[in-house]
């Protein structure tokens, strides 16, 4: 779904929302107002200064608007907090401001570097979650959509709130009891809150959900404002999708596997300030080493969890590709064949999901415009070159549990991530059978003349290389097959398909690549903590008789053991978002995905399905 852009009128060069008939901030003293109401109202400078080394702080807001409060908070954090501390910002907006309008609003503001980082990755108006890195130590999770629905989807541990937005008299639909319940659910004990409004309904609703509310001196012409402290945490029902609390530890994190799942995970953890050791088996190259790959997905007919996850991953990937060095992305349209009887429905569905410059349908093809072909070896090299990452060419055959963590060789790690694709020997038995091997062979051809710069994906993908006279065709798809030997039959089928696609060209077979991928049995990745199967089977066994029986039970996990695997043929599409989700789980940061989707991606889902289907012996 696409959100509606805010209707902005400039009055004396200051933004005015014509729908709500209100200003966004004090025209003359916007930053001073933000300092008084939100920064001082939450005692943020003192709290930022008091953070421990490597501390993390989460700040959430109910109305992003022009971004003034978020940029201001980030600037104060960078000035006050320890150099190893990190800030997570969350802000929602039902009516985002168009980028060019936002730049006009900002033209006289300070904090140039923060603004440029925002502009570089500012999302289109697609609803949902969009994670932006404003600074190596500051992340902003933008939630486009209704405030209540956005925060219902959110999973975070919030330390302070900016209760902002147009006044209750102007925007009553935002200031609803459901929003205040979500604020309480997400708040840490002793979380603080500040707001410009002193309306009775706001005071009453904050008090009702557990906040101790006080009137304070307001800013400029406003006599009062409110500050509050969360003193009565609500009881929250436990779920099998809950994941372990983060463990504070400055020791390196081990990532086993250096394919696209392992590399993106290591990179994301390194970007969040963690030291990472990556282990890879030199005798078993990963499928991600294929010379070229294309990220694509076909939006389905219905709004399934898979479509939601793939759509979120696509938007996240497009932001990541903007930041990649030259030579990694060969930008060209990605075309997918569309059946003629589906054209009208596809076009209507597309209009609800994308701007025309992002995706469109032309000549019976669905085009995506913001990505292209990826040089995967270069991409992996770039990701693993981060200064916080060290690589070890070493096969890991065993993980040994210790009181203080996991032993790998002579090193003990508090946290370990398994990104070992189809090589499952390090996984518990209950999770080993949840993935299957998929053999894929791609063939490369030389053409006698250049072709157009367009990727075409149907039964096979046709990817022109940068010189446009060499073509990647593939790949084959053979389930439960881990044979790495090249097959002439696959080459012959690819050659036939290439001739049919380019009948006017002569082709010459040059080389082939064989990779073995791991695909989950439901075609979605496994991302999250590694569960102790017996705890799930024991505590949720009643679901074998009735899935609707309420169960409020925690489950047990192997201590600080995680996995990112089962990406299948969608690795380049989903790996970046999967890595962000996993890093957030490990570090206690806000999840960049709707929490309802956890039921579709955490490894525990397969054990729960076993119970419901009566397959406990499988």
Curated annotation (Swiss-Prot):
InterPro entries with a match to the protein in the record: FAD-dep_OxRdtase (IPR006076), FAD/NAD-bd_sf (IPR036188), MnmC-like_methylTransf (IPR008471), SAM-dependent_MTases_sf (IPR029063), tRNA_MAMT_biosynth_bifunc_MnmC (IPR023032), tRNA_MNMC2 (IPR047785), tRNA_S-uridine_synth_MnmC_C (IPR017610)
Cofactor section: FAD
Record region (FAD-dependent cmnm(5)s(2)U34 oxidoreductase): 256-618
Gene label: mnmC
Annotated segments matching region tRNA (mnm(5)s(2)U34)-methyltransferase: 1-231
Upper classification of the organism: Bacteria, Pseudomonadati, Pseudomonadota, Gammaproteobacteria, Cardiobacteriales
Annotated family: In the N-terminal section; belongs to the methyltransferase superfamily. tRNA (mnm(5)s(2)U34)-methyltransferase family.
Keywords carried by this UniProt record: Cytoplasm, FAD, Flavoprotein, Methyltransferase, Multifunctional enzyme, Oxidoreductase, S-adenosyl-L-methionine, Transferase, tRNA processing
GO cellular component entries: cytoplasm
Reactions that this protein is recorded to catalyse: 5-aminomethyl-2-thiouridine(34) in tRNA + S-adenosyl-L-methionine = 5-methylaminomethyl-2-thiouridine(34) in tRNA + S-adenosyl-L-homocysteine + H(+)
Pfam families named among the record's database cross-references: DAO, Methyltransf_30
Listed EC numbers: 2.1.1.61, 1.5.-.-
Signal sequence bounds: none
Compartment(s) where it occurs, according to its Swiss-Prot or TrEMBL record: Cytoplasm
One GO MF term: tRNA (5-methylaminomethyl-2-thiouridylate)(34)-methyltransferase activity
Function: Catalyzes the last two steps in the biosynthesis of 5-methylaminomethyl-2-thiouridine (mnm(5)s(2)U) at the wobble position (U34) in tRNA. Catalyzes the FAD-dependent demodification of cmnm(5)s(2)U34 to nm(5)s(2)U34, followed by the transfer of a methyl group from S-adenosyl-L-methionine to nm(5)s(2)U34, to form mnm(5)s(2)U34.
Name used for this protein in its record: tRNA 5-methylaminomethyl-2-thiouridine biosynthesis bifunctional protein MnmC
HAMAP family attached to this UniProt entry: MnmC
């Amino acid at each position: 779904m696409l959100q509606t852009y805010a209707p902005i009128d400039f009055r004396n060069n200051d933004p005015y929302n014509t729908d709500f008939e209100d200003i966004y901030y004090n025209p003359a003293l916007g930053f001073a107002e933000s300092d008084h109401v939100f920064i001082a109202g939450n005692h943020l400078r003192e709290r930022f200064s008091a953070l421990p080394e490597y501390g993390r702080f989460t700040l959430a807001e109910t109305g992003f608007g022009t971004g003034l409060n978020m940029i201001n908070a980030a600037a104060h954090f960078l000035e006050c907090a320890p150099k190893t501390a990190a800030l997570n910002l969350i802000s929602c907006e039902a009516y985002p401001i168009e980028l060019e309008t936002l730049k006009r609003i900002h033209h006289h503001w300070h904090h140039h570097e923060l603004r440029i980082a925002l502009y570089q990755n500012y999302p289109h108006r697609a609803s949902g979650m969009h994670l932006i890195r404003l600074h190596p130590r500051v992340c902003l999770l933008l939630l486009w959509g209704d405030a209540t629905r956005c925060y219902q989807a959110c999973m975070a541990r919030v330390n302070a709130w900016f209760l902002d937005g147009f006044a209750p008299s102007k925007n009553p639909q935002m200031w609803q009891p459901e929003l205040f319940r979500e604020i309480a659910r997400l708040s840490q004990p002793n979380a603080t809150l500040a707001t410009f409004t002193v309306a009775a309904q706001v005071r009453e609703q904050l008090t009702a959900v557990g906040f101790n509310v006080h009137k304070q001196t307001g800013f400029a012409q406003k006599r009062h404002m409110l500050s509050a402290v969360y003193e009565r945490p609500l009881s929250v029902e436990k779920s099998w999708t809950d994941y372990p609390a983060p463990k504070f530890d400055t020791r390196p994190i081990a990532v086993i596997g250096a394919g696209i799942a392992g590399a993106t995970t290591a990179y994301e953890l390194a970007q969040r300030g963690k030291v990472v050791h990556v282990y890879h088996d030199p005798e078993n190259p990963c499928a991600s080493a294929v010379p070229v790959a294309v990220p694509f997905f076909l939006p389905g007919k219905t709004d399934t969890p898979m479509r939601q996850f793939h759509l979120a991953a696509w938007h996240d990937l497009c932001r990541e590709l903007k930041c990649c060095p030259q030579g990694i992305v060969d930008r060209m349209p990605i075309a997918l064949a569309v059946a003629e009887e589906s054209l009208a429905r596809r076009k209507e569905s597309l209009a609800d999901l994308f701007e025309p410059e992002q995706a469109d349908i032309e000549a019976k093809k669905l085009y995506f415009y913001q990505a292209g072909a990826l040089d995967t070896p270069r991409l992996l090299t770039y990701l693993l070159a981060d200064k916080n990452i060290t690589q070890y060419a070493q096969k890991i055959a065993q993980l040994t549990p210790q009181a203080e963590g996991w032993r790998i060789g002579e090193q003990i790690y508090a946290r370990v991530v398994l990104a070992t694709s189809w090589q499952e020997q390090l996984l518990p038995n209950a999770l080993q059978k949840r993935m299957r091997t998929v053999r894929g062979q791609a063939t490369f051809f030389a053409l006698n003349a250049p072709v157009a710069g367009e990727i075409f994906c149907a039964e096979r993908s046709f990817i022109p290389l940068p010189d446009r006279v060499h073509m990647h065709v593939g790949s084959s798809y053979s389930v439960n097959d881990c044979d790495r030997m090249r097959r002439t039959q696959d080459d012959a089928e690819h050659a036939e398909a290439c001739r049919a696609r380019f009948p006017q060209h002569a082709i010459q077979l040059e080389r082939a690549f064989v990779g073995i991928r791991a695909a989950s049995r439901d075609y979605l990745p496994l991302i999250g903590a590694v569960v102790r199967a017996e705890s799930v089977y024991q505590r949720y066994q009643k679901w074998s008789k009735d899935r609707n029986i309420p169960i409020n039970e925690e489950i047990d996990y192997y201590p600080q053991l995680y996995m990112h695997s089962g990406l299948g043929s969608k690795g380049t599409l989903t790996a970046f978002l999967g890595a962000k989700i996993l890093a957030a789980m490990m570090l206690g940061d806000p999840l960049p995905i709707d929490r309802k989707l956890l039921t579709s991606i955490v490894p525990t889902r397969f054990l729960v399905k076993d119970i419901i289907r009566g397959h406990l012996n499988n």
